[in-house]
Amino acid sequence: MYELDKKDKDILAELQKNCRQSTRTLGRKLGMPATTVYQRITRMRNRGLIKGFSAILDPEKIGLPTVAMVLVKRYVRKDGKMKSEHIGQALAKLPEVQEAYLVTGEYDALIKVRGKSEKEIGKWVVDTLWNMPEVERTLTLFCFYESKESHILQLK
């Protein structure tokens, strides 16, 4: 793990708010030369702390207002040869899946899916997930209200 100092944390906090800021603007805000900001950003990118820079889209405005969390139980062959990682890898490859996690408990994975409607997501679950050899069963939870969605990580 890379140890972040206060300057790195300040830079990352600002980039999470608005990654389109120039190094000059960031430097002015943070009281650092633009070259220092640039070097630190480059170092953090090279070390994998910054995975990339992207636009955050409004799902409703692009026609994907419906969110579902789907719990997935993996199918275990009688010889026990289906590992949890396999289901995670298989789910992560599906373009409709925004997030995929291996979890503890009765189910083995949790995925987040967005779609135009509950009907569309339901059809996708039946047509796609239920036809995967790795999947034994699913439990779909439709989200009726989004209290918070954030891509900002709190740096302490």
Residue spans for each PLM region:
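A compositional/biophysical signature of low hydrophobicity enriched in polar/charged and small residues
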Residues: 1-156
